[in-house]
Amino acid sequence: MPVYPREGKIIQIHSYKHNGTIHRIWQETVVLKGTPSYVIGGNNKTLVMEADGRTWVTREPAICFFHAKHWFNIIAMIREDGVYYYCNLSSPFVWDEEALKYIDYDLDIKVFPDMTYMLLDEDEYERHRREMHYPDVIDRILKNNVQKLIGWIKERKGPFAPEFIDKWYGVFQAYQT
């Protein structure tokens, strides 16, 4: 059994909180590339279900990047005025044939088309760190990964490289025809 989904497979993405409760489910994402190290997916107007049962639909095409070793995932949203990124500080992904899964650790970085960025939800992170008893080692890992992610943004590395989005959005569009 592979530890990653195969290309072309339509999968769900499940986000959990540290205490094991479901946080959010994305219903349909097509796998554009699956390896033991990373998964790249694409979706557009996919149904999302929140933990409380509310649902909404994504507004634009997105390319998603999940890594098996880094404590973050990256969603590139393709909009009329450019590519916006939403980066979740999270556990590395796991794949169990049901869904691609990760633990959401509250901290987020929003990146604008001009590559300026904002660290978000620090208050929520501190509150959940106390309430859910995040171990100190997790706190250190996450703070180190915030710095790693900022480095990637500044260097335009990985998903932040323009050619990355161009390539994978093209692959995603081919699946849509």
From Swiss-Prot:
One Pfam family cited in the UniProt record for this chain: DUF402
Reaction(s) this enzyme catalyzes, per UniProt: a ribonucleoside 5'-triphosphate + H2O = a ribonucleoside 5'-diphosphate + phosphate + H(+); a ribonucleoside 5'-diphosphate + H2O = a ribonucleoside 5'-phosphate + phosphate + H(+)
Binding sites annotated in the UniProt record for Mg(2+) 1: N88, D104, D108
Gene3D superfamilies with a match to the protein in the record: FomD-like
Similarity field: Belongs to the Ntdp family.
Enzyme Commission numbers on file: 3.6.1.15, 3.6.1.6
Binding-site list for Mg(2+) 2: D106, D108, D121, E124
InterPro entries, alphabetized: DUF402 (IPR007295), FomD-like_sf (IPR035930), Ntdp-like (IPR050212), SA1684 (IPR016882)
HAMAP family recorded: Ntdp (MF_01568)
The protein's name: Nucleoside triphosphate/diphosphate phosphatase
Cofactor or coenzyme needed: Mg(2+)
Keyword Transmembrane: no
UniProt keyword annotation of Chloroplast present: no
Residues making up the signal peptide according to the UniProt record: none
Keyword tags: Hydrolase, Magnesium, Metal-binding
Molecular function GO terms recorded: magnesium ion binding; nucleoside diphosphate phosphatase activity; ribonucleoside triphosphate phosphatase activity
Enzyme active site: R24
Superkingdom, taxonomy of origin: Bacteria
Function, as annotated: Has nucleoside phosphatase activity towards nucleoside triphosphates and nucleoside diphosphates.
